[in-house]
């Protein structure tokens, strides 16, 4: 039976924001398209504006996919699906998709595929590939909106074991989840995220802070997708207050090669 997804005032406001953003992107694309037509003899102008159009189109596409996930978050089709997709390839693919967008903000990317692990694993995730892709994409979009120019993003992943009591104690996690899990770390440098905002990140899709609206729909959606599949996600501050780390845990079956 499909669960009813009630629309309250906060959700109506959220939907209005999404519609406004999409209209804004479409308006921007039309403006740059007209400029290209009016400057057809200027190759450099055309090149710069095409890049802008591609970025805007990319954001529209991601927003619409995210909106679909969010609107469907309480339905019964979010069931555990097994897939043999290589997590490494999934993350590399998402990174490639976001490369131009992040580079446009001069965000440097370092990808660490954890080649130093002594034992190689095949990961059979208990979460559909599209949900993994959308969740990680949503986190990248959150970083894109939060990170300042000349930021740095480092992506890595490693396997963890919930039977490790020290890990459980340090992270305050419950041990009633699946023993074998996959931990993905996305590290980025940015100016301080206000503590009040950070505490509320996973509780509401639309926030107001210092009289400014802050739409963290991307992170909120990623959190819901992962947690509803018995995973977990949280933010750590590391080394200094300008560096943040997303920790994403996905439930998996781990098979030795």
Regions inferred by a protein language model and the residue ranges of each:
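Short alpha-helical segment of the dimerization/phosphotransfer core of two-component systems
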Residues: 55-63
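Conserved micro-motifs of the catalytic ATP-binding
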Residues: 75-80, 120-127
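Short conserved segments within the C-terminal catalytic ATPase subdomain
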Residues: 101-116
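Short beta-strand/loop element within the Bergerat-fold HATPase_c
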Residues: 150-165, 174-178
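Short conserved segment of the HATPase_c
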Residues: 179-181, 193-206
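Short alpha-helical Gxxx[C/S/T] motif in the catalytic ATP-binding
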Residues: 218, 222
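Detector for a conserved hydrophobic position within an alpha-helical segment of the HATPase_c
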Residues: 226-227
């Amino acid at each position: 039976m499909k669960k009813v997804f009630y629309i309250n005032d906060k959700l109506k406001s959220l939907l209005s924001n999404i519609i406004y953003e999409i209209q804004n992107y479409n308006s921007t694309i039309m403006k740059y398209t007209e400029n290209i037509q009016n400057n057809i003899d200027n190759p450099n102008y055309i090149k710069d504006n095409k890049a802008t159009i591609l970025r805007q189109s990319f954001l529209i596409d991601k927003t619409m996919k995210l909106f679909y996930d969010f609107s469907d978050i309480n339905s019964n089709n979010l069931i555990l699906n097994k897939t043999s997709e290589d997590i490494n390839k999934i993350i590399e693919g998402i990174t490639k998709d976001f490369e131009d967008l992040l580079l446009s903000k001069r965000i440097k990317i370092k990808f660490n595929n954890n080649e130093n692990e002594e034992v190689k694993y095949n990961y059979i995730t208990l979460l559909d590939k599209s949900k993994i892709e959308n969740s990680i994409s949503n986190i990248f979009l959150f970083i894109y909106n939060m990170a300042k120019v000349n930021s740095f993003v480092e992506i890595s992943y490693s396997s963890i074991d919930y039977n490790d009591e020290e890990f459980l104690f340090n992270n305050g996690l419950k041990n009633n989840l699946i023993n074998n899990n996959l931990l993905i770390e996305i590290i980025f440098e940015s100016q301080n995220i206000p503590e009040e905002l950070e505490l509320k990140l996973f509780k509401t899709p639309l926030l107001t802070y210092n009289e400014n609206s802050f739409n963290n729909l991307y992170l909120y959606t990623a959190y819901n997708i992962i947690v509803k599949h018995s995973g977990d996600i949280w933010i750590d501050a590391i080394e200094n207050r300008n560096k943040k780390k997303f920790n994403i845990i996905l439930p998996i079956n781990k098979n030795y090669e």
